[in-house]
Design a protein with these regions (language model features):
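N-terminal small-domain helix-loop-helix segment of the aminotransferase-like
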Residues: 5-109, 116, 296, 406-408
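Conserved core of the PLP fold type I
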Residues: 67, 71-204, 221-222, 226-236, ...
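PLP-dependent enzyme catalytic core of the Aspartate aminotransferase-like
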Residues: 88, 350-408
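Helix C-cap/helix->beta junction micro-motif
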Residues: 145, 176, 208-209, 365, ...
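Conserved core segment of the aminotransferase class I/II
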Residues: 235-312, 319-321, 397
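Conserved glycine-rich beta-strand-loop-beta hairpin in the small C-terminal domain of fold type I
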Residues: 294, 310-319, 331-345, 379
Length: 408
């Protein structure tokens, strides 16, 4: 049975105007002082949620639970299929086995899980290693925990692909006595999908210096080619050193419903994280969030397969259009996630523009992107491609006509 109001099984084509429907993505323009000029429709391409309906299996699971019992009393995970659904998903999508239910813990958010692991292994003022560019959620979480951020810059090779600088990482780890590193796998905001050998090398380097790894794998379902490699899966040592964070909220457009989970094989770390969460009553499972995950993971595989085709087409279209811009805007070839990190340095230098002016101009024609500077991209913008293909075509037509080729 289907409860979705959308006629099609998977509707990735309808342009959803979400203004006034409690959508931060649609109701907020993130560029201070910017506004959309009259005559241009809004094409929000900033914060990372999708302009697609969630999977029918998610709607079925939520409504099915409401129909089964309209009572929303105190809730327990037992009997929901929560653990089995997670293990099934990782087995089928990532070709890995999570053997023991106990290594899985409900988390109210990925960043909440990240924060707990930071607090387990470090004290206030201690350094935490991040890659740069980096996700703004990491910097905010580390700062909120009153720890010190140490950055290791990713380097771009001759093809523009972001690579880890292992020599620099080791230097930073030794000089700063790093005890915790945050790893984004795949990487946000660059969209880099790390190859297994890179993950292995990163883990080995951290193990060499007894650095604990927090691996944010919320984007792990958005791999354009091949399968995701969980950081904890590359070796037995990795299982002991890696605390991995996941959520179905990114994949199935459920960020507003809230809910995530961790996979932590280290018994001591897992116990301490649970103790910290208990102190604040933080990780109390949400009944509808859990049933949504079970519906997503048990029956949502086909939805994700079709979704990836749309994302891949959208990103490829944008990449192809940018190749006609004469090198003014650069990005690496899309590999994963549904965001791309656009480098406007050449454009700004040749046109005499500032990044503030570029962002204002993009918004003025309705293309609402995200300032890349908080992600440590000095002249960058992050674009979100989880929207109908027609919106991407229109957005990049406008950028070509009104930003790249126009005098302003």
């Amino acid at each position: 049975m289907a409860y979705s109001k959308f006629a099609k099984r998977y509707d990735f084509e309808t342009v959803m105007d979400r203004r006034g429907l409690d959508s931060r993505k649609w109701d907020v323009i993130p560029i201070p002082g910017a506004s959309v000029e009259p005559g241009f429709s809004h094409i929000p391409m900033w914060v990372a949620d999708m302009d697609f309906p969630t999977a029918p299996s998610v709607i079925d699971a939520i409504v099915g639970r409401l129909f089964a019992s309209p009572a929303m009393g105190y809730f327990g995970l037992e009997g929901t299929g929560f653990y089995d659904a997670i293990k099934k998903w990782h087995r089928e999508r990532n070709n890995v086995e999570i053997v023991d239910n106990d290594v899985i813990s409900y988390e109210n958010s990925v960043l909440g899980g990240v924060s707990n692991v930071i607090r387990v292994y470090t004290n206030e003022g201690d350094p935490v290693l991040l890659h740069s560019p980096t996700y703004i959620g990491f910097t905010g979480t580390v700062n909120a925990a009153k720890r010190t951020i140490v950055l290791s810059e990713l380097k771009q090779d001759e093809e523009g692909t972001y690579r880890m600088d292992f020599e620099d990482m080791e230097k930073k780890v030794v000089e700063n006595n790093i005890k915790v590193a945050i790893f984004c796998n795949p990487h946000n905001p660059t969209g880099r999908v790390w190859e297994p050998w890179e993950i292995q090398a990163f883990v080995e380097l951290m193990v060499k210096h007894d650095v604990k790894i927090i691996s944010d794998e919320i984007w792990s379902d958005f791999i354009m080619e091949g399968k995701h490699t969980p950081a904890w899966s590359v070796s037995e040592l990795a299982k002991d050193k890696v605390s991995a964070m996941y959520a179905c909220t990114k994949t199935f457009n459920l960020a507003g419903l809230v809910g995530a989970y961790s996979v932590i094989h280290n018994d001591e770390c897992r116990a301490k994280c649970r103790e910290l969460a208990a102190q604040t009553h933080y990780n109390q499972p949400n009944v509808l969030s859990v049933h949504a995950l079970v519906g997503a993971y048990n029956e949502g595989g086909e939805y994700v397969d079709e979704l990836l085709k749309v994302i891949k087409s959208n990103q490829q279209h944008a990449y192809d259009v940018m190749q006609t811009w004469g090198g003014l805007v650069k990005t690496q070839k899309p590999q994963g996630t549904y965001v791309m990190f656009l480098d406007w340095t050449e454009f700004c230098e040749k046109r005499g523009k500032t990044m503030d002016e570029v962002l204002q101009k993009c918004v003025s024609v309705g293309v609402i992107c995200q300032d890349g500077r908080p992600f440590h991209g000095p002249c960058h913008a992050r674009f979100n491609f989880a929207c109908p293909h027609s919106s991407v075509v229109e957005a990049f037509d406008r950028l070509t006509k009104y930003v790249i080729n126009a005098e302003w």
